[in-house]
Amino acid sequence: MDKILILDFGSQVTQLIARRVREAHVYCELHSFDMPIEEIQAFAPKAIILSGGPNSVYESDYQADPKLFELGVPVLGICYGMQFMAQTLGGKVESGDKREFGYAQIKARHHSKLLEGLQDQIDDAGNGFLDVWMSHGDKVTQLPAGFQVIAETPSCPYAAMADEARGFYGVQFHPEVTHTKRGTEMIHRFVLHVAGCKPSWTMPNYIDEAVKKIREQVGDEEVILGLSGGVDSSVAAALIHRAIGDQLTCVFVDHGLLRLNEGKMVMEMFAQNLGVKVVHVQAEADFMAKLAGETDPEKKRKIIGAEFIEVFDRESGKLTNAKWLAQGTIYPDVIESAGAKTKKAHTIKSHHNVGGLPEDMNLKLLEPLRELFKDEVRQLGVALGLPHDMVYRHPFPGPGLGVRILGEVKKEYADLLRQADAIFIEELRNTVDEKTGKNWYELTSQAFAVFLPVKSVGVMGDGRTYDYVVALRAVVTSDFMTAHWAELPYSLLGRASNRIINEVRGINRVVYDVSGKPPATIEWE
């Protein structure tokens, strides 16, 4: 199978490069810029992509091994990656007079395999222009030998460069972001035409390979998996069960912070429909006791994570034959974990299920989804026969409703929130947008209700009420790195509000969150 290697110099959007490559049905992996040349050779990439990054090429701490340019494979340098390529191969990089951040238009020059025929506009003289996204201060001021300029802007005469003979290309802009309109085509052109990769990275092929790999790893030993009801653990369970059947036992911990009827749905789908062995643990009282009195969001996450591990450890200890612990770790988790280890990533919110496993568990780790992005996990779930509605549900945080209840978590609050959230989701599913023919659940990327621990005065019937408030949140995003609040129809919001206030005793006011990300995050905690 053909593979692309992406070396990460610390850009905030490096994952998007991998996404674009995978969209061409070509397998790729993302590794740190300082990956030893011996490991690069062992990986045997068909081509290499150098990411952008926040640093200057003059900082010696951020240099890849220059021998990568001697491997005889095409290389694409993006932003910092272009500057590193230019400097390493004998060109010059200097601090620019003008910094370029945001939208820019580049003018294509000469013919190149990378850009030929791609344009967003053409001027009267017949010159092609591309709309791109820039984010740089330094710039290339002298090309290395063998290179020619293939694009320019008024303030950046070398906006893109190429050495066609060696298959080396550099672009000062970011083709991986959606703001660069033809960026995906550029990356696909590099991967498929310049590098000559075959588009063989498909779900049927992946399933066959994964099943074979799991059987080779596990042999006749037993595996346990913590089933949360979320997409990742559910798909991991279905894949492992296809590979080894009854050698898999799932432990489903109901911490009392799940969505309405979620526990019942999980048991029906896995235990009854798929025939997976599932141990159902009712642990609501344990979690509520540990969370009592705690209001800090980060501490709540850690309490929920620690308690989940404790309960899971206790239950899995009863399965004395288990030698493997399976997890629904996906590729972004792996990338973020690696970034944290090298101090290149800042902790925004801690992941309750990454890292904190007991050291004395003595179990080998099985992570069959660790090479997949979220959209690929969903495709895999459908290919494995999981219900489409379940696989394409909106994201749900690991700590569940624990971080959608502001402040202290109580059973009373969770019960109210569960009902309100279910009504909101039902109204989204039942309301169809006439322009697109899709319902509003499909048109939003994530939607949920948030419980606010404040009371407001209301009037119901002839009496005064003093009850709780819930906020509704719905966003639209392509990558969850930025998001816009969803402009839902007033009629939909009105129905949802009316139903929540009338059907959920204890709530008398509903508000809608119109904050984008940034400055707000999608979740409230």
From Swiss-Prot:
Residues 201-393 form the GMPS ATP-PPase domain. Pathway: Purine metabolism; GMP biosynthesis; GMP from XMP (L-Gln route): step 1/1. It is an enzyme of class 6 (ligase). It catalyses: XMP + L-glutamine + ATP + H2O = GMP + L-glutamate + AMP + diphosphate + 2 H(+). One of its GO terms (cellular component) is cytosol. SUPFAM superfamilies: Adenine nucleotide alpha hydrolases-like, Class I glutamine amidotransferase-like, GMP synthetase C-terminal dimerisation domain. The active site is at C79, H174, E176. Keywords: ATP-binding, Glutamine amidotransferase, GMP biosynthesis, Ligase, Nucleotide-binding, Purine biosynthesis. Residues 3-200 form the Glutamine amidotransferase type-1 domain. One of its GO terms (molecular function) is GMP synthase activity. The keyword ATP-binding applies. The keyword rRNA-binding does not apply. Pfam families: GATase (PF00117), GMP_synt_C (PF00958), NAD_synthase (PF02540). CDD domains: GATase1_GMP_Synthase, GMP_synthase_C. InterPro entries: Class_I_gatase-like, GATASE, GMP_synth_C, GMP_synth_GATase, GMP_synthase, GMPS_ATP_PPase_dom, NAD/GMP_synthase, Rossmann-like_a/b/a_fold. Its EC number is 6.3.5.2. ATP binds at S228, G229, G230, V231, D232, S233, S234. NCBIfam families: guaA_Cterm, guaA_Nterm, PRK00074.1. Catalyzes the synthesis of GMP from XMP. HAMAP family: GMP_synthase (MF_00344). Homodimer. This is GMP synthase [glutamine-hydrolyzing]. It comes from Chromobacterium violaceum (strain ATCC 12472 / DSM 30191 / JCM 1249 / CCUG 213 / NBRC 12614 / NCIMB 9131 / NCTC 9757 / MK). The gene is guaA.
